[in-house]
């Protein structure tokens, strides 16, 4: 059986993003900056501290990178940070990625600080889907978690995103015991009449948040059981869902997604690769230090070498992370490679 053509060509097995465990990777998470203007207590409680002097990937380097991934079968790109909207050329980056043959969906994750005034422009540039980090629906708790007293402004941005016409608007909320766990009913009531997918994400341990993790980690399993006991039904997973478990209710316009990295077989459905803002390929959020791609990003003439390096790197991808053993790999914090 022949494989689906890409740009009129046929992909052979050696040119596909498939690892040794038959997982297929059609989703690229691309960080364009590790700078963030929030001080979230689970990620950058002391604010952004630059740890390198490297320049972030240029728009041309990004274009060359995504072109290579697209020719290897990638169909979706999520632009991440840090806070990606801090880059002045963010709309141009969206447009550049959206026009690459083979890329079917362009998404981003943002803290929403300037979303209310930019949502329409990003949509017009070619952005299809947007995730907004809203870690509490209580303004005071939001301020406590993020270090920013702009809850209403962020929520205005969420509304602006819906009005702009995005195919999908998602809300990300990191679950934290003793901080925002009391907000769960507020969240669920809120999406009753909102066409939004609410995503509860388990707090994950990184190199620098061990004490915070031990104090505030909360398993998503109890939320899952609560949902099932209250009329919610788990959707059959689609390939683009990745490890997320999605739930729907006939009386609710919105959906709920659970991302539980400590659950059994979480990595079995992994469908994504990550590239950092300085051009390092990361096979896992909690994996190794990464494979440098930048020396091959300066010119499109190196595209075949770039594709080969990416494919070869996949051979070393492990079957799973080792978070349950307290090993967070080389990830200092979630902003470092885009979460």
From Swiss-Prot:
Residues reported to bind GTP: 29, 78, 109, 170, 272-274
Cofactor binding remark: Binds 2 [4Fe-4S] clusters. Binds 1 [4Fe-4S] cluster coordinated with 3 cysteines and an exchangeable S-adenosyl-L-methionine and 1 [4Fe-4S] cluster coordinated with 3 cysteines and the GTP-derived substrate.
The EC number(s) this enzyme carries: 4.1.99.22
UniProt cross-references to InterPro entries, sorted A to Z: Aldolase_TIM, Elp3/MiaA/NifB-like_rSAM, MoaA, MoaA_twitch, MoCo_biosynth_MoaA/MoaC, rSAM
Keywords, in A-Z order: 4Fe-4S, GTP-binding, Iron, Iron-sulfur, Lyase, Metal-binding, Molybdenum cofactor biosynthesis, Nucleotide-binding, S-adenosyl-L-methionine
Binding site for [4Fe-4S] cluster 2: 267, 270, 284
Pathway: Cofactor biosynthesis; molybdopterin biosynthesis
Family per record: Belongs to the radical SAM superfamily. MoaA family.
Protein name: GTP 3',8-cyclase
Originating species: Psychromonas ingrahamii (strain DSM 17664 / CCUG 51855 / 37)
Gene field: moaA
